């Protein structure tokens, strides 16, 4: 939607790394290896900041996103203000530290014996007891509500991750990859909301899901009280970035459109 240069200020914090560390990981994600943590790197997209902030408000775990400066010759592996950089022509991307914790088994949506991705009910059936099943279902429904509000178009096997703890309880891992959202032009002509766990083909499909999972209705209604522009401003301010006025107008319009959609769903 915009370049990082439109948003930078002298106070913007940038994490500096050396370019030679950059490579593809096993999932073809660009990443940088450090001695302590792996950093996933992608092109600048401020929707990641907003998705993260919405997750914080809704108590949904998410990846943390920050600016990364690549091929900087001094003071690597630390944050530095943009005004303090000797070379301000460096390549600035978006980064997030690997959120995986030791002792937990992380996995993506599994395939069944017919080589098809398993559905919501099948992933829930992997839970060891009813308590864990209900916990995981609530976590997934909260993801559904967030994504519907944000207009997420690609919540699929590449960006849905789960983890299993030492008690074999299964939970949704932190959410990440919000870049295909907050943009009406990205809307699929086939799906209102595309998720590999459950296909919401239209509003009626969502209503049918709500008839047996009322939590989705309440979660969607909670977004009617959220001001997307305020969320965007907060997420930019926390990173000492400026938000272009044209983008503010876009977020205001998008917020209005999504709230009209939610009202149609929950009425």
Residue ranges and their predicted role:
Residues 103-127:
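A broadly used, surface-exposed interaction patch
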Residues 37, 45, 76-82, 89, ...:
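Short, structured coil/loop segments at alpha-helix boundaries
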Residues 56, 163-267:
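C-terminal catalytic region of ATP-dependent kinase domains
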Residues 1, 15, 134-135, 267:
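Intrinsic structural disorder
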Residues 43, 120-187:
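Conserved kinase catalytic-core segment
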Residues 116-120, 133, 216, 258:
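Short amphipathic alpha-helical segments that mediate assembly, nucleic-acid/protein binding
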């Amino acid at each position: 939607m915009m370049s990082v240069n439109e948003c930078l200020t002298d106070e913007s914090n940038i994490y500096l790394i050396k370019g030679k560390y950059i490579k593809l990981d096993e999932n073809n994600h660009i990443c940088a290896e450090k001695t302590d943590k792996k950093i996933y790197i992608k092109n600048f997209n401020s929707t990641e900041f907003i998705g993260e902030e919405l997750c914080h408000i809704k108590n949904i775990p998410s990846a943390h996103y920050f600016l990364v400066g690549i091929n900087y010759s001094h003071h690597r592996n630390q944050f530095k203000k943009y005004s303090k950089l000797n070379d301000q022509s460096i390549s600035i991307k978006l980064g997030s530290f690997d959120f995986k914790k030791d002792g937990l088994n992380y996995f993506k949506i599994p395939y069944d014996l017919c080589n098809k991705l398993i559905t919501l009910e099948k992933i829930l059936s992997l839970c060891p007891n009813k308590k864990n099943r209900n916990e995981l279902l609530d976590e997934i429904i909260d993801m559904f509500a967030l994504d519907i509000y944000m207009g997420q178009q690609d919540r699929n096997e590449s960006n849905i991750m789960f983890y299993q703890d030492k008690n074999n309880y299964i939970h949704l891992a932190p959410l990440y990859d919000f870049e295909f959202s907050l943009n009406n032009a990205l809307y699929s002509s086939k799906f209102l909301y595309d998720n590999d766990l459950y296909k919401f083909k239209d509003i009626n499909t969502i209503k049918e899901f709500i008839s047996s999972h009322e939590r989705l209705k309440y979660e969607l209604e909670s977004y009617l009280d959220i001001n997307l522009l305020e969320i965007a401003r907060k997420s930019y301010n926390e990173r000492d970035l400026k938000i272009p006025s044209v983008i503010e107008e876009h977020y205001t319009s998008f917020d209005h459109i999504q709230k009209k959609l939610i009202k149609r769903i929950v009425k």
